[in-house]
Amino acid sequence: MITPLAPSTPSPVLTPIEARVLGTLMEKARTVPDSYPLTLNTLLLGCNQKSSREPLMELTEADVAAALNTLKEAHLVRESSGSRTTRFEHNFQRGIGVYEQAAVLLGLLMLRGPQTAGELRLNTERWYKFADISSVEGFLEELQDRSAEKGGPLVVKLARGPGTREQRWAHLLCGPVDATQTGLGRSSEGLPGNTAERLERLESELANLRETVQKLCAELGVSPPEQV
C-alpha cells in the first residue's frame, strides 16, 4: 500500500479535463495493469470512451497533453521511464495525501460524476472490493471531514433529489460544489412521483443484477463485462 503524504496546502483545483485525464490514469492502473503506464494515444482513447464516463467528452490530443503538463507541475502525474515511447502514470495518492480506498472513490467520482454510496460500491468492483456500503460511507465521511491541515474536504454530500431515498456524493477536486443541488444528472429529478419511483426501483434492480453477474464471473473465473 502506498503511504500518502500529508499536504499542508489546499488540494489543487482541477479543470474538468484535468480531472478526466487523472481519473482515467487511475482507472487504467487498476483495470488494465498490463498496459499501464499509458501512452498519450491510449490515454486519449480512455478519456473519450463512451462507457463509464459522465459526462462524455471529445478531447483532442492537444487537450490531453496540456492537462498532463499541468498535472505534472502539480506532482499528480509523472512520465514513466524505461520505454522508448513516452508513457504517463498518476501520483494521486501521494500528491493529494489519501489512502487507496479514498483514492478509488475520488477516481470514480471524477470519471462518473455524483453517485450514491451504493452506486460507488458497485462501480468500484474492478478497482477495489469494499466489504459493504457502510465501509464506502465511512471513507466518504472521512474525506468530507478532512481537516484544513491535510488540504481540506475532498467530497460533499448533495441534497436528496425528488423521489429518491439516497443522497449522492460529489468530489471537490474541481472546486466548490453547491451542496443543495441534487446531483441527479441523468436520473429522476423533475419526473412525476410515480415515474421517479419506478425509475429508482429499476435502478435498484439493475444494481442487484450487476452484483449477481459479478459473483457469477468470479465463480467462473472470467472477467466481468464493461459497465455502461
Curated annotation (Swiss-Prot):
Residues in the signal sequence: none
- Pfam families, sorted: DUF480 (PF04337)
Alphabetized InterPro entries for the sequence = DUF480, WH-like_DNA-bd_sf, WH_DNA-bd_sf
The record's annotation in Gene3D superfamilies points to: Winged helix-like DNA-binding domain superfamily/Winged helix DNA-binding domain
Tell me where on the tree of life, at the top rank, the source sits.
Bacteria
Which protein family is named in the record? Belongs to the UPF0502 family.
Please report the name of this protein according to its UniProt entry.
UPF0502 protein Rfer_1648
The species is Albidiferax ferrireducens (strain ATCC BAA-621 / DSM 15236 / T118) (Rhodoferax ferrireducens)
**Organism ancestry:** Bacteria, Pseudomonadati, Pseudomonadota, Betaproteobacteria, Burkholderiales
